[in-house]
Amino acid sequence: MYPVDLHMHTVASTHAYSTLSDYIAEAKRKGIKLFAITDHGPDMEDAPHHWHFINMRIWPRLVDGVGILRGIEANIKNINGEIDCSGKMFDSLDLIIAGFHEPVFAPHDKETNTQAMIATIASGKVHIISHPGNPKYPVEVKAIAQAAAKHHVALEINNSSFLHSRKGSEDNCRAVAAAVRDAGGWVALGSDSHTAFTLGDFTECRKILDAVNFPEDRILNVSPQRLLAFLESRGMAPVPEFAEL
């Protein structure tokens, strides 16, 4: 449906089951042009060591015509918006996603969750907030969407939230999509794949977007060029190899 997927996990996050090579093969099969590997930040119990992220610099940029972005799904750690990505990790990464995960930041009341998420958005360190519609972490959706639009941060619609994880996310995600639409911000679609078989599956995301008449021109996944322009506007250096995507 879209040629870009921005959220997936490899065997480096040990509750996932596919390798980088598996994802490349599946991307070729499905016509995915660009994807981001976003294993969990090191504060999660089964996450890779921070060296894993630093060493992503050895990855090729293109394999058989498929572009690979070096990313992380970092953890929001506290109400100050600190994340478990720092120092040399930033130097090796193209894409920083951050979100709430219970082993790192336990669910709080709506005010506290909102404060932590807005602080993360405003930090300038994050490109995308993952699964902001998680019902375990209620937030002030309009305030989050307005902050994200102001700071040029995308809010994710996460396909896995409607299938395997975060049950009860539908109403919240419709509210997120509508609030982003009204604020003039961006959404990012993520399969949140933990196995390569679901790479590029945005079927449930599309239902959410259609329900609120979300504009296609505010979806980052529409083309590699749109996503790369967004990242470059946030400071990522152009990647010459991606010019052919």
Swiss-Prot record:
> Where is Zn(2+) 2 annotated to bind?
15, 40, 194
What domain of life is recorded for the organism?
Bacteria
CC per GO annotation: cytosol
User: A single GO BP annotation from the record?
Assistant: bacterial-type flagellum-dependent swarming motility
Which cofactors are named for this entry? Answer: Zn(2+)
Q: Which residues bind Zn(2+) 3?
A: 73, 101, 131
Give the EC number(s) under which this enzyme is classified.
3.1.3.-
List, alphabetically, the Pfam families matched.
PHP
**Co-factor note (free text):** Binds 3 Zn(2+) ions per subunit.
Q: Which residues bind Zn(2+) 1?
A: 7, 9, 73, 192
Q: Name one GO molecular function term.
A: zinc ion binding
Keywords noted in UniProt: Hydrolase, Metal-binding, Zinc
InterPro entries in the cross-refs: Phosphatase_YcdX_put, PHP_dom, PHP_phosphatase, Pol/His_phosphatase_N, Pol/histidinol_Pase-like
UniProt record similarity statement:
Belongs to the PHP family.
Quaternary structure? Homotrimer.
- PANTHER family in the cross-refs: PHOSPHATASE YCDX-RELATED
Q: What is this protein's record name?
A: Probable phosphatase YcdX
